[in-house]
């Protein structure tokens, strides 16, 4: 099954930390087969772990999360979306960080809703965006 919901890095952090609780509660109402993360998000999570080598609890929590969720490869369809989004945003003088652009492009390529509380994603035309931090 293709992911219906793509979790961004901040959303995954909320899930791992358990705060805000609304995010975990919403996740529990969705079949895990419909949830995924981008390989870009996986890279960001692993970078966060590498930055805190003295936090074995964080490493365990991230590893356990990655075992439970499908990590979706960033592919040529996502690359096509990335080019279009980046061009559009730069034309309007509204640049976005490359990793966020890659995650947004991945969600568009998958036709999935991006789960994020980051309002910057609202600038991406056609992106289905859901904020699970609000109950």
Segments and roles (model prediction):
Residues 11-12, 41, 78, 103, ...:
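Alpha-helix capping/helix-boundary segments
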Residues 39, 75, 118, 133:
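Residues at the C-termini of beta-strands that transition into short coil/loop
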Residues 3, 70-115:
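Active-site neighborhoods of divalent-metal-dependent phosphate/nucleic-acid chemistry enzymes
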Residues 124-134:
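Beta-alpha-beta core module
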Residues 1-37, 47-66, 133-135:
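Short, well-structured N-terminal submotif of metal-dependent ribonuclease cores
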Residues 8, 38-41, 117, 125:
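A secondary-structure boundary/capping signal
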Residues 8-9, 23, 45, 82, ...:
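Generic structural signal for small/hydrophobic residues in well-ordered secondary structure
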């Amino acid at each position: 099954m293709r992911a219906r919901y793509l979790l961004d890095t901040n959303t995954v952090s909320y899930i791992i930390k358990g705060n805000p609780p609304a995010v975990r509660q919403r996740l529990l109402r969705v079949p895990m087969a419909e949830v995924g993360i981008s390989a870009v998000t996986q890279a960001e999570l692993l970078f966060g772990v590498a930055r805190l080598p003295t936090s074995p609890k964080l490493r365990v929590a991230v590893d356990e999360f990655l075992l439970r969720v499908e990590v979706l490869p960033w592919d040529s369809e996502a690359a096509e979306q990335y080019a279009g989004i980046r061009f559009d945003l730069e034309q309007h003088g509204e640049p976005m960080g490359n990793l966020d652009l890659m995650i947004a492009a991945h969600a568009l390529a998958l036709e999935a809703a991006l789960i994020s509380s980051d309002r910057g994603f609202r600038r991406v035309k056609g992106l289905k965006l859901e904020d699970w931090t609000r109950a």
